[in-house]
């Protein structure tokens, strides 16, 4: 296995401006929609990481303690999901067949814990808000030829990225190559 590397930052023109083609996905074809989201998450992962970081920085500036608590709670919930999926076949099957529900469950657990601790608003601003914006962009952005080539290289194992590892942990590695 090759070393894990972050792909280059995609141009703003490619990401959201001029050449970016944004089209609503077909809700009647969830498989194709899922492939679009996964492939866009892989291709634009550096841009998404920056967007997520900006959301965390903004919330961290406003409420630093609640932002750290939010990040910790979500990391623990995600770690528990991955650990449970590695040890229990039923959880692994659920994670693979219902990835959106698993992500929603992780975010819901994080929200409930932080609501009890008084940091629900910060959680929504720092974690859930950027994740929602990233998923909306990944759903709307049509793939281009360069995107498809990069995703093929990732899927055959010639290149490893942090998003690829995260998708594997969430049980989506078989989807990424499609």
From Swiss-Prot:
One of its GO terms (biological process) is protein transport. Its main location: membrane. The chain crosses the membrane at residues 42-62, 65-85, 97-119, 123-140. It is found in: Endosome membrane. GO terms for cellular component: endosome membrane; membrane. The keyword Membrane applies. The keyword Ribosomal protein does not apply. InterPro entries: Prenylated_rab_accept_PRA1. Belongs to the PRA1 family. May be involved in ER/Golgi transport and vesicular traffic. Plays a proapoptotic role in cerulenin-induced neuroblastoma apoptosis. PANTHER family: PRA1 FAMILY PROTEIN 2 (PTHR12859:SF1), PRA1 PROTEIN (PTHR12859). Interacts with CCR5 and GDE1. This is PRA1 family protein 2.
């Amino acid at each position: 296995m090759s070393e894990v590397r972050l792909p280059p930052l995609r141009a703003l023109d490619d990401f959201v401006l001029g050449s970016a083609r944004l089209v609503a996905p077909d809700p009647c074809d969830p498989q194709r929609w899922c492939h679009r989201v996964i492939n866009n998450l892989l291709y634009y992962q550096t841009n998404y990481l920056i967007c997520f970081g900006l959301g965390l920085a903004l919330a961290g500036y406003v409420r630093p303690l609640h932002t750290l608590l939010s990040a910790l709670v979500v990391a623990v919930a995600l770690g528990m999901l991955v650990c449970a999926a590695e040890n229990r076949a039923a959880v692994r099957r659920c994670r693979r067949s219902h990835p959106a529900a698993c992500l929603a469950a992780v975010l819901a657990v994080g929200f409930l814990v932080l609501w009890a601790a008084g940091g629900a608003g910060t959680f929504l601003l720092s974690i859930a808000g950027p994740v929602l914006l990233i998923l909306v962009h990944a759903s709307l952005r049509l793939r281009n030829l360069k995107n498809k080539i990069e995703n093929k290289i990732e899927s055959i194992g010639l290149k490893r990225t942090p998003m690829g590892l995260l998708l594997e942990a969430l049980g989506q590695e078989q989807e990424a190559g499609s």
